[in-house]
A protein has these predicted regions:
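Catalytic cores of enzyme domains
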Residues: 1-135
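Alpha-helical scaffold domains
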Residues: 86, 94-208
């Protein structure tokens, strides 16, 4: 969820460097959609370069449509607020269906990018290197649920999850444990139910 007023994808399309794929991501030929976009704002008028691309190259591919856990790709209008990536970052209350949709995800969802043929090479060559070494083996859900503020900052400050705050990540870890009915989830509940007003983060309380 970007917080800035400028939509980089739209400018990138107008510049002709790529197209908006069926999964709503900017796809750049040879690079796919796992890219970071930046803007340079000028106070002088410049003539734009000719567009390098003026059409979508998704063709008849439906991989992202079929893989989307929220089942929103390919439908108009695109319901961005139902996207699982959005839900994992939202501080708003989640419905029971949305909670189930998160599955084991605690932050973000790249399923529609992971299945995209245009990302095949990038997934193989570079995606793993984009994660901090401390997170490459995954995240322990119960450990995440019990993180102190200092521990959260130390582990997640350099990731996209760092800016969203500890509460959101812990809520998602709690829901992930609940979704798989992990025995540790039931143990955690028993340990906290006697004094949940003090021990349970407020953002988790509605889901107990």
């Amino acid at each position: 969820m970007d917080t800035g007023p400028l939509v980089e994808r739209a400018f990138a399309v107008r510049a002709g460097i790529g197209w908006i794929g069926r999964n709503q991501h900017l796809i750049i030929p040879g690079y796919g959609s796992f890219v970071a976009l930046g803007l340079l704002l000028l106070d002088v008028k410049v003539e734009p370069d000719p567009s390098l691309l003026d059409r979508s190259l998704c063709g008849v591919c439906q991989r992202c449509v079929e893989a989307c856990p929220a089942l929103i790709i390919g439908k108009e209008p695109f319901a961005a607020k139902h996207c699982v990536s959005y839900l994992t970052q939202s501080k708003e209350g989640l419905t029971d269906e949305e909670c189930k949709r998160l599955g084991l995800r605690i932050f973000g969802c790249d399923t529609c990018q992971e299945v995209c043929p245009h990302n095949r090479k990038r997934m193989k060559d570079e995606q793993t290197d984009s994660f901090p070494s401390s997170l490459r083996r995954g995240v322990d859900l119960l450990e995440t649920l019990n993180l102190t503020k200092a521990e959260f900052q130390q582990r997640f400050h350099s990731t996209a999850a760092g800016w969203r705050g500890k509460g959101v990540l812990q809520r998602n870890a709690f829901l992930a444990l609940r979704n798989v009915q992990d025995s540790r989830y039931r143990l955690w509940l028993r340990e906290h139910e006697k004094d949940k007003d003090k021990l349970v983060p407020p953002i988790i309380s509605p889901y107990l």
